[in-house]
Amino acid sequence: MTIQSNEFNVAIVGAGVAGLALAMALHRKGVLFTIYEEAKEYSVVGAGIGFGPNGMQALDLIEPGFRPLYEGLCVGNKSADAQWVFFEGYLLEPGLGDNKPWAGNLKSAWGNQDYVRKSAHRKELLDIMTSFIPIESVKFNKKLVSIKEYTDRVMLEFADGEIVAHSILAGSDGIASTVREYLLRPTHPEEALPVYSGAHCYRAVIPMDEAYEIMGEKTDVAKIYFGHNRGAVSYRITGGKELNFLLIKATPNEQWPYPGRVTKQITQEEMLADFDGDNIDDRFRRLVAKAKPVKWGLFHHAKTSTYYKDRVCILGDSAHASMPFQAAGAAQGVEDALVLAYILEELMKSPTRGSEQLEEINAGLAAYDAIRRPRAQKQLDRAFEVGTMIYFQHPECGDDMTKILHKLQNGWLDWLWFPDLKADVETALSQMRNDVQKKA
């Protein structure tokens, strides 16, 4: 690819939720882009996925046509009186805590009356998102192997030998991001790779009739089950026809034993052994027996010192891969895409091109970083903290469910769910314009 001197063109590496959201936004704004995806097609790995109110607010601003399509297929809690519930807390121990004074009648639930739970299957979500993106702007089987920056362009080389030039590279290539490593290894090598959080999980999607046979009415409302160094998460997807679940084991003092990979095929016996013991309700052993014997390490990007350098930036899991316990990773990636798209639109509209635009680009990406990085980092930190609550490792709460629920039920998610994203965009654009004026 050769970029004309007057052409502003964005490379998006990675076709996950954040990359697709950015592509949707850029397409609507008329900003030229190409998505480069390593896989041969869009990935459906991940099964259940959802957006909080902040994610839906961001998508409304990116593409108003998204919401009606998404709401036509997503599903929430079954009970009409539980639509506001994010999760309801119970125990992993025999009896599930049904006899505890804090349990029953949604007493152990947390959420918000202005929140409505919505979850979908990842494939259904991607089908909607990709319907807003021209297929000719997407290239599959593109494994990025090299990045080279010049004052007037960034060059990408792929494993098939193709070399392309773009004005900006936006890396949304997931937790094991090539773009992140390029960005951070020279100055912050300890941040280049994801960090093991001290826990692993097993995951599955099963038909609701099978789930109901095991868990009964506990399948009606999204649940988190708390336990000593173990936990479980479950919620309905696919219009209520299936249950998505994770079963988690915490190993806080151990290192991940499989360097260079985040998953490991193991035996059925090894998987079942993680949920042995008299302190675990037998229903969870029946559930884990339905999972594939694949151990998923729970990794995250514990700290990230910058989301950009010159013409290269990161978003989504490449920037802030997180624990899943606030179901917030996808929405944070969409927020990234929203702010970044407005910055890139501003750069496209500028008459400056080539080397002369580098200062402008730095001002724009610095503004993106200033708005998005602190908020995404806070979400990441809080999601990790919820994990410590689930495994009864929280330094303040321990295994005291009354203390845990007090934390979760008193506005724990309000700051995350109800931001003013229009104000975030305006603040980013204002900072960018001010920086450009100062340097003029």
From Swiss-Prot:
Fusarium verticillioides possesses 2 unlinked loci, FDB1 and FDB2, necessary for detoxification of antimicrobial compounds produced by maize, including 2-benzoxazolinone (BOA). The FDB2 cluster arose as a duplication of the FDB1 cluster with rearrangement and expansion by incorporating additional genes. GO terms for molecular function: FAD binding; monooxygenase activity. GO terms for biological process: secondary metabolite biosynthetic process. FAD binds at residues 37, 50, 122, 317, 330. It is a single-pass membrane protein. It comes from the Eukaryota. This is FAD-dependent monooxygenase FVEG_08293. Keywords: FAD, Flavoprotein, Glycoprotein, Membrane, Monooxygenase, Oxidoreductase, Transmembrane, Transmembrane helix. Its cofactor is FAD. Belongs to the paxM FAD-dependent monooxygenase family. InterPro entries: FAD-bd, FAD/NAD-bd_sf, FAD_monoxygenase. The chain crosses the membrane at residues 7-26. FAD-dependent monooxygenase; part of the Fusarium detoxification of benzoxazolinone cluster 1 (FDB1) involved in the degradation of benzoxazolinones produced by the host plant. Maize, wheat, and rye produce the 2 benzoxazinone phytoanticipins 2,4-dihy-droxy-7-methoxy-1,4-benzoxazin-3-one (DIMBOA) and 2,4-dihydroxy-1,4-benzoxazin-3-one (DIBOA) that, due to their inherent instability once released, spontaneously degrade to the more stable corresponding benzoxazolinones, 6-methoxy-2-benzoxazolinone (MBOA) and 2-benzoxazolinone (BOA), respectively. The active site is at residues 203, 235. Disulfide bonds: none annotated. Disruption phenotype: Does not affect BOA degradation. Glycans are attached at residue 77.
